Each structure stands twice: as structure tokens, then as C-alpha cells.
Amino acid sequence: MLQSRNDHLRQTALRNAHTPALLLTTLTEPQDRSLAINNPQLAADVKTAWLKEDPSLLLFVEQPDLSLLRDLVKTGATRKIRSEARHRLEEKQ
């Protein structure tokens, strides 16, 4: 019960625009990056590093760079990722 409450509080902090950048980066575990990727407090260099490490996070970005999205359509790790990237690209164009 305590673990699930802590998880809930951490996930709320990841989404909250008022969470300080240092705390945001510290709280974020790899599986939670999709929640935090759109937080305006997240430093641009951290976001860039995350996207370089895991390009599929681009699917969770509200305003993705279209050239990066095109690359993901071509080089996504799985068919599902490539398909979702193609769908997002069609929406944005």
C-alpha cells in the first residue's frame, strides 16, 4: 500500500509543471520518462539525452520534431513503434 502511494506521488510530481528540474530528473526512472518528457521544467539537454537513449519516447512528445519522427518511422525498434510513429506523422502533416 505504501509503495503504491509513493508511486502515485512520484508520478504526480513528474507531471507537475512546478516540480523543480533537479527533483524531476532525480525522480525519473527509465519507465517513467514518458510521463515526464512533456514537463516544461525538464531541461532541454536531459530531454535530448533521453530521446537519444530511447528514440521511442518521441511518441510521447506533444510537439515532436517531424524529422525525428520520420527517422523513427524508418528505424523504430519494433513494428508497433514504427506504425505508431507513422500514425503520429500523418496526424502532424
Curated annotation (Swiss-Prot):
Tell me the protein's name.
Putative uncharacterized protein YkiA
Pfam families xref list? DUF2773
What family does this belong to?
Answer: To E.coli YdbD C-terminal region.
Mind telling me which InterPro entries this protein's record contains?
Answer: DUF2773
Name the source's superkingdom: Bacteria
Q: Which organism is it from?
A: Escherichia coli (strain K12)
